[in-house]
Amino acid sequence: MKRWDQRPFEIRNLFNPAFCGLVLFRALHSYEEEDARGMPFSLSLLVLPLCLHKDSREVIASSPRSYLLKTTEKNQQLMVGFADRVTQMLPYTFEGFGLLMERGCIVIADDGRIQTVPNKVRKTFTGTDETVSCQKVARVFGREFARIADRVTVYMTFGIRP
């Protein structure tokens, strides 16, 4: 991974660690509303590739109350290239987590689940329409991952071998 000042302007803006951390935090917090134990680390790796990918985000945003498994089944195009997107987004996911840890916004439980720390991040969504959309969709994914409650099912739904 290149140093921050050596990255292209577009990459610095699109994959800003603070924004990536915020999107991750929204998903983690939403997951905790369904399951207080926190989100498994393996599921958290799927959040950014889903929320920052415009097509995926738009499909979920258009039907936020639908079940994720049903929505994914109806929209198979979401899975095209998804495994590669996850791999490509790992460095940015780790940077986002690094910033959240540094700022004391998340903790890692003994069982490896990630939990949010209360009152560390504003509850209101601010920013451009697109950044707000990313945050709202992150909440949907967090909630749906918790409702499915099985990592293998989530991974298989998106065509990834766990």
What name fits each language-model region?
Residues 70-92:
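Helix-adjacent hinge/juxtasegments
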